[in-house]
Amino acid sequence: MITGIKGFNDILPGEVERWQHIEATARRVFGLYGYAEIRVPILEKTELFCRSIGDTTDIVEKEMYSFVDKGENAVTMRPEGTASVMRAYIEHKLYAQDPVAKLYYMGPMFRYERPQKGRYRQFHQIGAEVTGVTDPKVDAQVLTMLCHFFAELGLTEPTLQINSLGCPECRPVYREALKSFLRERLDRLCDDCKRRYETNPLRALDCKSAHCKEATADAPAMLDHLCAGCDDHFAATRRHLERAGTPYSINNRMVRGLDYYTRTTFELVTGLLGAQSAVAAGGRYDGLIADLDGPAVPGIGFAMGVERVALLLGQQEFARRPDLFIAALGTEAQDEAFRLMCGLQRLGVSVEMDYEGKSLKSQMRRSDKFNSRFTLIIGSDEMASGRATLKAMDTGTQSDVLLDPTAIAGQVK
């Protein structure tokens, strides 16, 4: 038997409906805030992610699915969505159409990681991006929209944590302060953090190693090294969050795993998923578009893991109930049931029937399995009279109905 690849999961009926609910909620909520959907390719030039995410990140160093294609091009299956969306934004000159672009995306991403609960090698993200505005009100609105989405799903447990990573003016000062702190603790860091000490010391704050977490527990905070502009921006973002009624807490150790973030960074975290506590995360990336050879346009965005959101929804039932199940006894009744089913489906009624000529008892068990809203039984008497009894399964109420698609649709829709 050929099985699926480790970390690449099938999403089966019963679970798909949960995903569709998440996606539909995102489309509805994001639409309220003026976002339009964009769809970008799964495969991109490897250079895109090296330049955007950062050469010294875990994603680029260890996790990307990269290969050289038959045309000798170095390509990568996208590990995240922001870089691809910004590449499309630049390539198609969306900045010339409107100074402010609001975009969202959905789709699979790929990283070679150790599969575990809520983390897979093919995983799915829903993300949103805003370009063209540095005003901290936009930061607050993006965060408010994200929290609004989770509230619409009925999920109040994930909590918002925010931080500021400063800008190219103040981050070098913090970088030196952090290097000075780490210099006395290098022997306690993991090999990766030792190697990155010179090139990217901030990665030590994001390291998953227990030794590194312990060694950096009292590390200096970026918030204590912000320049006046970044300090004002972070303070204004917090004020606007409070005006919007969006609760938050400050996590001054948050650095995220992507090098392009500046100023506001954030996560929605939960204690319900074990070690995989972040269900959504993002931040501001005011230099990314210029770094990718686009104009000097600021941006901010986020992505959420659909698998993790689905886990938070638990065992809620999202499978759609058929409107009607038709139980038919005998060949002529089955033919009539098929005619009615086709006519009803054209009228927008969801219908199921038995195709195997089973007993009435067996067909009623199948109706129960489908959890249909109504059941219609057709036998020889019903064929002779042209009428049948329609039963509402939730209430037990019965009504007499003509064996006609329009008449039945009027009763069940």
From Swiss-Prot:
GO terms for molecular function: ATP binding; histidine-tRNA ligase activity. Its EC number is 6.1.1.21. It is an enzyme of class 6 (ligase). Keywords: Aminoacyl-tRNA synthetase, ATP-binding, Cytoplasm, Ligase, Nucleotide-binding, Protein biosynthesis. GO terms for cellular component: cytoplasm. One of its GO terms (biological process) is histidyl-tRNA aminoacylation. It is found in: Cytoplasm. Gene3D superfamilies: Anticodon-binding domain, Bira Bifunctional Protein, Domain 2. Transmembrane segments: none annotated. It holds the Pfam family tRNA-synt_His. It catalyses: tRNA(His) + L-histidine + ATP = L-histidyl-tRNA(His) + AMP + diphosphate + H(+). It comes from the Bacteria. InterPro entries: aa-tRNA-synth_II, aa-tRNA-synth_II/BPL/LPL, Anticodon-bd, Anticodon-bd_dom_sf, His-tRNA-ligase, HisRS-like_core, HisRS/HisZ, HisRS_anticodon. NCBIfam families: hisS (TIGR00442). Belongs to the class-II aminoacyl-tRNA synthetase family. Homodimer. This is Histidine--tRNA ligase. The lineage of its organism: Bacteria, Pseudomonadati, Thermodesulfobacteriota, Desulfuromonadia, Geobacterales.
